[in-house]
Amino acid sequence: MTHTQTVMLRLLTMCIPFRNLRKKWRTFLRDFLSDYDRDARRSMRAWRRHPVAGRTILILEPNYCHGEVIPGFCRHLLDMGYRVDVLMHHSLARQSPLCCFKEGDIHIFTAMCTSWKRLAKARVLTRYEAILISTSAFYDIPGWASFLHMTGLDKFANLLAVEHELKDIPRFGEEELDRQGRLLTLGSFPRGMMVNPHFFGEIPPAPRNREPVFITVGSLSAQRKNHELLVEALETVCNEGYRNFSVIIVGEGELGKIPGHLRPFLHVAGKLDFPAMYEAMRRADYFLPLLDPGNPAHNRYITTGVTGSAQLVYGFAKIPVIHEKFASFYGFNDRNALLYREETLGGAMLRAIRQTEEEYAE
């Protein structure tokens, strides 16, 4: 919000006599104005009046992220004979995560954050055979909150929820969902039922580019990926005299300092919408998850959560270049991936560059 909007907000609520009530209204109006989207308001009204057909399941994503899992869930349900409606935050919808479906295959609706708290009161929910929440946490609240409890959806008996972080099961009180088999996870963990969606359209096998293309996708933060590993690997490859390759970097954030002699090999695309990201994935030959075995923060990707990189590798059938520590959890081995340990990422990238088209196709 701008300073002028903040001042106007305070003036509008000054007439409310009770401090707690005044604070509550200021918070609501601030959230409403900062997230306001006219199309989303219209879409939400249309959804509430929507004549839901039989055997329809609602997929609901309350956040601005995790759009990569929605197409796979939609594909699974459509293949099982269900109809699918999707309700998502308007900022995610603008990124077009469902661009791989034909118009009419799925009904798509959008909403603002301020619509979520009253969601459970919507009568249209009773018409769905089931409701699938693709992220159980609501990230718009500091420290995150349980979207199910916040909205009252946890009281629905036909609810399924996807938990992206096992540590949140006790924090959000999801033990009963887990016991009833209604809590889903994207990986094979001791808790939750594994369902790994990774559909991004019909993607035929493609031959390797004459000059191999590597790609990494995701937020440029040390907590998620170690991009210093990539710089070191590029140094290794260049020192061996190879120049016939490129690396596409997709994601928001700061990459850090890149030596000038390495920049010609990098294409920093920044954050892309889903159609552009899908196109970049199609052009690539190898995927770089950039998980660091020496970073304790990356242990969560084999203990309590998964990396979204795996969904992209599975769905686009790209060869991952990944450290052995993380490989087996995702089903990667010497037959379907390029693994490294002592030889480092640079050594594995050299093996990729030296592969023939026949070896790649195997």
Locate the predicted segments by residue.
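Conserved catalytic-core segment of nucleotide-activated headgroup transferases in glycan assembly
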Residues: 70, 199-203, 208-261, 267-277
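Short beta-strand->alpha-helix junction loop in the catalytic core
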Residues: 91-92, 165-167, 187-205
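Short acidic alpha-helix that forms the nucleotide-activated donor recognition element
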Residues: 273-286, 296, 315
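A short, glycine/small-residue-rich beta-strand->loop->alpha-helix junction that serves as a flexible
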Residues: 35, 39, 47, 59-72, ...
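Nucleotide-sugar-dependent
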Residues: 289-311, 315, 323-331
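Extended catalytic core of nucleotide-activated donor transferases of GT-like folds
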Residues: 43-44, 58, 69-79, 85-181
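Membrane-proximal basic amphipathic "stem/tether" segments
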Residues: 1-56, 61
